[in-house]
Amino acid sequence: MAFVPPQAGYDRAITVFSPDGRLFQVQYAREAVKRGATAVGVKCKDGVVLAVEKRVTSKLIEPESYEKIFQIDDHIAAASSGIIADARVLVDRARLEAQIYRLTYGEPVPLTVLVKKICDLKQMHTQYGGVRPFGAALLMAGVNEKPELFETDPSGAYFEWKAVAIGSGRNTAMAIFEEKYRDEMTLEEAIKLAVLALSKIMEEPSPESIEVAVISVKEKKFKKITPEEVAKCLEEALKEVEAEEVPEKEEDYSELDSNY
């Protein structure tokens, strides 16, 4: 008889807890996020920034078709890491919920309301048979009364951050944020910090492999940064990387067990 690992029985159904209180399928979904391209978000006094690493695996791929930052509403955006197809389903649901709220109440949806709805959907996919957890995490950013930045976990948990990263480069980016983030940063400084974090993670950073979007407090409108602006920020970031050592990783941010 073939040997069956002790945890195998708990792997076969999403609704079954292991004896130590874990849902293995949720943990595997988190592993999919850890393998994904890095996405970062930075909140500042006059807006919020999202930036992502675009892993273009072939020179034949049109970089513009490889979208990793999505506009949800005029004032809300999302960046993804993990399984792109799963992220697209979550983004489509977020867009639908934003439209329903606007038609129902005649005003833009608050980001906190939208984040909760998306995380409720994620949580449902950890509780019912016949489904699996979403193998994607989202950074959701927006401006209603003030800039806000949330991370959504495959488990359905969500956290608000000043600066955060998801994906394979999370620990390195978080170490940079811990060292360099300031509450009084301007939007321009936040863009540079986000690009700096990605440039340290990527082997060959280029303007074509970094996507950046911002939402400012003044305009409350989603806007993607042009490749020329990204190139300028990247040039400054690479000079800074050469000039100083990046701090060592002191803390592991790869998994937040606030669910237990």
Swiss-Prot record:
Biased composition (Acidic residues): 242-260
A GO CC term attached to the entry: cytoplasm
CDD domains, A to Z: proteasome_alpha_archeal
Molecular function in Gene Ontology: threonine-type endopeptidase activity
Keyword Cytoplasm attributed: yes
The entry's keywords: Cytoplasm, Proteasome
GO biological process: proteasomal protein catabolic process; ubiquitin-dependent protein catabolic process
Positions of region (Disordered): 241-260
Location of the protein in the cell: Cytoplasm
Regulation of protein activity: The formation of the proteasomal ATPase PAN-20S proteasome complex, via the docking of the C-termini of PAN into the intersubunit pockets in the alpha-rings, triggers opening of the gate for substrate entry. Interconversion between the open-gate and close-gate conformations leads to a dynamic regulation of the 20S proteasome proteolysis activity.
Domain of life the protein comes from: Archaea
Predominant place of localization: cytoplasm
Subunit structure: The 20S proteasome core is composed of 14 alpha and 14 beta subunits that assemble into four stacked heptameric rings, resulting in a barrel-shaped structure. The two inner rings, each composed of seven catalytic beta subunits, are sandwiched by two outer rings, each composed of seven alpha subunits. The catalytic chamber with the active sites is on the inside of the barrel. Has a gated structure, the ends of the cylinder being occluded by the N-termini of the alpha-subunits. Is capped at one or both ends by the proteasome regulatory ATPase, PAN.
Family of this protein: Belongs to the peptidase T1A family.
Its biological purpose: Component of the proteasome core, a large protease complex with broad specificity involved in protein degradation.
Protein name: Proteasome subunit alpha
Organism field: Thermococcus sibiricus (strain DSM 12597 / MM 739)
